[in-house]
């Protein structure tokens, strides 16, 4: 196995806000040493310039969906873990929207046992004929965390036994969707203050949304798609701002998607409320213009893979979300990874289920779309993808592992280049740049 010496690698420390240059020794796809640039080069090492590489803490994901149990035809737990590792994630938090849902301790125990059976996650799977196989890590640590259901069956009608789920080891509580019963939500805030774990809420009023699938505005009218008004998000955030001062529950606002939503989060934080917020990464790169015009050269307009929940906003929303991440008002960028089958994502735009895969795409796409365009710094991006998600989850901000990222490595998103069988992404068949090439564990 070849040993490589990569001098002059950029090393990011988002905790200290420092950037240095180091020498990284890589064997296969494992980082075996990180030294300063005075480190003597091993006699058996091939010296390859490392100026373009980035060494930084592994990433952390606040929330995503697992197909297992119940939806293994979409994606198995093994595939989810492997695609997360390939994307550079050391911590992933899974929503309780499985079948059965994670509303009882027994389901969590089953998931933990199932995860322990996936020994192959540390012996990285390489699909036959995969042109990127030689650039992936052999082994890497990933820690799975689980959100416990707020309500039984995630139906928003009756609270689960929070104490039992807490003792079983959930990272926090969420239904993965919008809770509409405000009296029940008030009780959840009361229980959350006792548990002391984050309560992740989707700010969405379903009555105001109606059957909307595209953000309300001229483009929705032009395309003939049912509109979803900004107020369906903003009204819920504003109402929660009235409730939160009365409780000590750490609340996380999921999937902020509008400029008005960002303004309300600014207001919440200026009041000193115990809250954090995140944005789905697609909303930082895409606007509703993509639905109208597609993503050249391979993604057509009305592409079902461009349907998200919440829907993509206008360009003003996108820029406000980017500024929110840069300023820290939006604490974290969430992957919100959700696999679907071919049959599910080849329906009409209004009928297809919302969501897309993301673990292996989020870092290269955000690097290309934001960092290379000087819309965000590498340090700010890493805080939003690594340090801050861990803080929002109540985990230590310092990762116990680091990844080596090559932002210049070219590849094409197609069958055989991902560690998941799902391919519901608007970037399918697109040429991309950026890959995680090694892990330090």
UniProtKB/Swiss-Prot annotation:
The keyword Lyase does not apply. InterPro entries: DHOase, DHOase/Allantoinase_Hydrolase, Metal-dep_hydrolase_composite, Metal_Hydrolase. Gene3D superfamilies: Metal-dependent hydrolases. It comes from the Bacteria. One of its GO terms (molecular function) is metal ion binding. SUPFAM superfamilies: Composite domain of metallo-dependent hydrolases (SSF51338), Metallo-dependent hydrolases (SSF51556). GO terms for cellular component: cytoplasm. Keywords: Pyrimidine biosynthesis. Residues 121-140 are annotated as: Disordered. GO terms for biological process: purine nucleobase catabolic process; pyrimidine nucleotide biosynthetic process. The keyword Transmembrane helix does not apply. Non-functional DHOase. PANTHER family: ALLANTOINASE (PTHR43668:SF2). Belongs to the metallo-dependent hydrolases superfamily. DHOase family. PyrC' subfamily. This is Probable dihydroorotase-like protein. It comes from Synechocystis sp. (strain ATCC 27184 / PCC 6803 / Kazusa).
């Amino acid at each position: 196995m070849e040993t490589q010496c990569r001098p002059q690698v950029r090393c990011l420390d988002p905790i200290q806000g420092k950037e240095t240059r180091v020498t990284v020794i890589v064997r296969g796809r494992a980082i075996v040493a990180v030294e300063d640039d005075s480190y003597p080069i091993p006699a058996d090492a091939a010296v390859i310039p490392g100026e373009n590489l980035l060494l930084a803490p592994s990433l952390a994901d606040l929330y995503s969906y697992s197909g297992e149990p119940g939806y293994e035809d979409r994606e198995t737990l093994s595939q989810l873990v492997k695609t997360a590792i390939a994307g550079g994630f050391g911590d992933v938090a899974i929503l309780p929207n499985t079948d059965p849902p994670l509303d009882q301790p027994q389901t969590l125990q089953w998931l933990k046992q199932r995860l322990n059976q996936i020994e192959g996650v540390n012996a990285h799977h390489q699909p036959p004929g995969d042109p990127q196989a030689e650039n992936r890590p052999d082994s890497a640590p990933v820690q799975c965390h689980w959100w416990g259901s707020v309500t039984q069956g995630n139906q928003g009608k009756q609270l689960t036994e929070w104490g039992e789920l807490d003792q079983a080891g959930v990272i926090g509580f969420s239904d993965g969707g919008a809770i509409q019963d405000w009296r029940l939500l008030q009780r959840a805030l009361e229980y959350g203050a006792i548990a002391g774990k984050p309560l992740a809420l989707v700010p969405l009023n379903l009555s105001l949304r109606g059957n909307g699938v595209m953000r309300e505005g001229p483009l929705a009218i032009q395309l003939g798609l049912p509109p979803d008004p900004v107020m369906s998000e903003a009204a819920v955030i504003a109402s929660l701002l009235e409730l939160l001062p009365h409780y000590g529950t750490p609340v996380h606002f999921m999937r902020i998607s509008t400029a008005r939503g960002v303004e309300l989060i600014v207001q919440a934080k200026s009041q000193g409320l115990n809250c954090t917020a995140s944005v789905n990464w697609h909303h930082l790169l895409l606007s509703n213009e993509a639905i109208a015009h597609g993503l050249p050269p391979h993604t057509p307009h009305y592409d079902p893979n461009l349907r998200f929940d919440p829907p993509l906003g206008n360009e003003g929303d996108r820029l406000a979300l980017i500024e929110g991440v840069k300023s820290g008002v939006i604490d974290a960028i969430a992957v919100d990874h959700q696999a679907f089958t071919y049959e599910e994502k080849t329906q009409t735009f209004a009928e297809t289920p919302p969501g897309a895969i993301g673990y292996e795409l989020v870092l290269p796409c955000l690097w290309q779309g934001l960092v290379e365009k000087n819309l965000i710094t590498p340090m700010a991006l890493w805080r939003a993808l690594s340090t801050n998600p861990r803080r929002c989850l109540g985990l230590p901000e310092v990762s116990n592992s680091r990844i080596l990222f090559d932002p210049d490595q070219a590849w094409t998103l197609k069958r055989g280049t991902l560690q998941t069988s799902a391919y519901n992404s608007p970037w399918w068949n697109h040429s991309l740049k950026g890959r995680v090439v090694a892990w330090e564990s």
